[in-house]
Amino acid sequence: MKFENLLIEVGTEELPPKSLRTLAESFLANFEEELQKAELSYESATWYAAPRRLALKVNALVTAQADKVVEKRGPAIAQAFDADGNPTKAAMGWARGNGITVEQAERLTTDKGEWLLHKAKVVGVETKSLVAEMAQRALDKLPIPKPMRWGSNKTQFIRPVHTVTMLMGDELIPGELLGIESARTIRGHRFMGVDTLELDHADNYLTALETQGKVMADYQARMAIIKADAQAAADAMGGIAEIDEDLLEEVTSLVEWPVVLTANFEEKFLDVPAEALVYTMKGDQKYFPVFDKAGTLLPHFIFVSNIESKDPAQIIAGNEKVVRPRLADAEFFFETDKKHSLESRLASLETVVFQQQLGTIKDRVERISALAAFIAQGIGADSEQAGRAGLLSKSDLMTNMVMEFTDLQGTMGMHYARLDGETEAVALALEEQYKPKFSGDSVPTQPISISVALAEKLDTLVGIFGIGQAPKGAADPFALRRAAIGILRICVENNLPLDLVDLVAKAQELHGANLSNADTAEQVLEFLMGRFRAWYQDQGISVDVILAVLARRPTSPADFDSRIKAVTHFRSLEQAAALAAANKRVSNILAKVEGDIASDIDSNLLQESAEQALASKLNELQPQLEPLFANADYQQALALLASLRESVDTFFEDVMVMADDEALKQNRLALLSKLRAQFLHAADISLLQ
């Protein structure tokens, strides 16, 4: 068996930087899937990507499929021959289709009967003859939302394709990908190195591109160089570069030959809130901002050039010239905005419609204000400050800065509130009202921020459900799923004594006649419960644990979380499986009972020692369980209930529940009902698998 290294490169025009990595990873994953289908073994595989190329390399790929024997079963012997022993038409047709005669067929005998059998030897195909088709299928399955055509070519791809190279070792694999014939020619950097080069061997791909073409095709190596050089450059300026992963990925996808350079801007711009300057540098220019060790923005930035210039000072000056007017715009917006307080902008909110049926933004902030004050009372916070923060929560939407840089909503509200002399709690709440903004984002922890963040999300959630525009399928234009998860996380992570029923009811009350959906509250609560399930599943919580808690429909998120943790712990106990099965048995018995079950147990009717022991154990645990359930200490309560396992097992072994004597039967049903009720204080344990 022989092995060779395979290289495939698709040379294109500039690929979208935000999807470059995904495209390269998908190309490799799809091709590896093709290799597995073709039963072609290999040692390892990797992907490469640069702005104008996607490539993959497969190491130690077998040069041909292994020969194999394929068994082809024919008709059963009873159908293969007639009464005289002559082959039937079915047998002859099958044999002819396999290129043999019936006499040449073998027999397959099993305990189910006997059949004709042909063992066909299939000679393995050379790998090189399969590569082009496999690569084309891999490319066809790439996640490309809007493919394009170019020239007179009917082929579609994410960008026009100019070169295709497929090499197995030093051998060029003939074939066509995306309408382009495979050749040894690959393109170098647009402005440095050779324009094109001829690749002689798959193993020389990275080296030839780097030394002759001035292209670093190894994405990971390119990213590592940018990160290390940027940190070193910041360190040389006495600062720390802020390198977030998304921007690092994007910059890596924009350059073929990374050269890290540093530049400066005027210190006067530091009077503008740092977030606005950073937003401009990162979002518009793809620069890395530099901070001191205390987290204060410095008047420097780091950028990555795609060319190794003989005069880097000229490139630096050019970037400084480009960023200066953008920072000046931010400065102008800030100075202009400062002339008007957030409170003075409330009137202008009346001119902006939030949603046609739900009124203006002014209507919205008045609802948020009242709801935030209500929530603050429930968590022991200052309701006046919460109401104030709610009222001012959207005023920054009318500022020049936020109109220009929409992602700064909330953040600029915080800065303007401080300038207006609002309390720090109110100012902070204006920024934190939108948290958590994404999965993994932190939640607000200050009481006023919590109140406004919950109110802001509840107002949207209840309002949109109230006008019958709940999310359908993947569509969620008002980001209600994110809002729901935010509500749950804020309540759980801050262990808040809040009930969703009360919160939804208050939000619904504040919307007043705006809402046309009579089932608003019920639908919102159902939606929140569904988000709870999704959130816990994402955390790896077992579905049966979630269902066991959902069966009790606890509407306090903090209480829900306590139950989830308690049942998860209970599930790990040795006694859990037996008690879950017993609960299921009890549930089935009680479900078949017609009429009411007595709430009291008559000790005089406890005849069997097993039922006496179970009743005694329940009575013994009762005074210990009551305070635990009252304090939502479900974990300790379930741990105590786990001690019932032996008594429960013995009861079902020795006691006939459905006794002929009606009084005995009813008393035993009452005992089982009491047992099940204790577990149901926490969750429906019978649902555990």
UniProtKB/Swiss-Prot annotation:
GO biological process: arginyl-tRNA aminoacylation; glycyl-tRNA aminoacylation
UniProt cross-references to SMART domains, sorted A to Z: DALR_1
SUPFAM superfamilies documented for this protein: HD-domain/PDEase-like
Enzyme class of the recorded protein, top EC level: ligase
Its EC number(s): 6.1.1.14
A Pfam short name: tRNA_synt_2f
A Gene Ontology cellular-component term: cytosol
Major subcellular site: cytoplasm
GO molecular function: arginine-tRNA ligase activity; ATP binding; glycine-tRNA ligase activity
Keywords, comma-separated and alphabetical: Aminoacyl-tRNA synthetase, ATP-binding, Cytoplasm, Ligase, Nucleotide-binding, Protein biosynthesis
Keyword Membrane: no
Cellular localization per UniProt: Cytoplasm
Record Gene3D superfamilies: Isoleucyl-tRNA Synthetase, Domain 1 (1.10.730.10)
Family: Belongs to the class-II aminoacyl-tRNA synthetase family.
Complex formation: Tetramer of two alpha and two beta subunits.
UniProt-recorded name of the protein: Glycine--tRNA ligase beta subunit
Organism: Shewanella loihica (strain ATCC BAA-1088 / PV-4)
